[in-house]
Amino acid sequence: MRIVFAGTPDFAVPSLRSVTQRADVVAVYTQPDRPAGRGRELTPSPVKLEAVARGLPVYQPQTLRSPEMLEQLRALRPDLIVVVAYGVILPEAVLAIPDDGCWNVHASLLPRWRGAAPIQRAIEAGDTETGVCLMQMEAGLDTGPVLMSLKTPINAYETSGQLHDRLAEMGAQLLSDGLGLLRAGLRPVPQPQLAAGVTYAHKLGKVEAQLDWEQPAERLACRVRAFQPWPVAEVVLCGERVRIHEALALDLDHSQPPGTVLAASKEGIDVACLQGALRLCRLQREGGKAITAADYLNARRDLQVRA
């Protein structure tokens, strides 16, 4: 089976490895090298690095819509195109090239959380379950029928980064299982997505990192986990803007205005919210590194506590 693989970030690397064990990967498509780091040097994608290490042909077109790119893809004669977090919407002309169509590994239980940030939005919303889907691609954004899926609970203190790594491996396993069925002539049966359950996972933005104490503690705790490792939640704490890397929601009654420090100890700094309180466990001052609440308190002797 001849497969063209299209993917870009770390999430796609386990799936690329999985495909190479199941089929003949005739080409890998990934986004062009981008400036990164303080020096803004051109940096290859994780998928490109993996493909080069495996000796696979790599293509990095700016667009898939030009006649030249379409002809290049047709010349590869793929039986199937596998897409995992490629970051480019495939035009219908590309979807029509392989006999078996195009498969996509998506990090949610579709139709919930279609779009760019399904992992982060699931945690932000307080979902207790998520998973990965293998989808038959069509022209719409994550609208195609689901071929297979795997479910998993979202752990109470799991961050987006941790869930990302788990789902990447689950997606690779699901893809391997799907390819195994296809090779055996047992093509997975497409199941149309139900319109009633559709939600959209819009792309994250830095502006969302600013937390507002005028919200329930549970919601803020979910956002701290969702925005880890990027963009990292930020709050104003007694006049200082700090980033929050770890926090817990406390179910307690208080009569203080949101943003008031209720208690401070080596376990954390408890801040009043609209409902309950948020315990800040790991913080980062501007220009510094992430530190424990105890270390932060040693540096902030002026912190005022109101019981």
From Swiss-Prot:
Q: State the HAMAP family in the record.
A: Formyl_trans
Entry keyword annotation includes Transferase: yes
**What is this protein's function?**
Attaches a formyl group to the free amino group of methionyl-tRNA(fMet). The formyl group appears to play a dual role in the initiator identity of N-formylmethionyl-tRNA by promoting its recognition by IF2 and preventing the misappropriation of this tRNA by the elongation apparatus.
Which residues are (6S)-5,6,7,8-tetrahydrofolate-binding? S108, L109, L110, P111
What SUPFAM superfamilies does the record tag this protein with?
A: FMT C-terminal domain-like, Formyltransferase
Q: What is its EC number?
A: 2.1.2.9
Record PROSITE patterns: GART
- What is this enzyme's catalytic activity, as reactions? L-methionyl-tRNA(fMet) + (6R)-10-formyltetrahydrofolate = N-formyl-L-methionyl-tRNA(fMet) + (6S)-5,6,7,8-tetrahydrofolate + H(+)
Checking InterPro entries in the record gives: Fmt, Formyl_trans_C, Formyl_trans_C_sf, Formyl_transf_N, Formyl_transf_N_sf, Formyl_transferase-like_C_sf, GART_AS, Met-tRNA-FMT_C
Supply the gene name.
fmt
Cellular component GO terms held in the UniProt record: cytosol
Q: What is this protein called?
A: Methionyl-tRNA formyltransferase
Q: Which GO terms describe its molecular function?
A: methionyl-tRNA formyltransferase activity
- Record's family? Belongs to the Fmt family.
Keywords attached to this entry? Protein biosynthesis, Transferase
EC class name: transferase
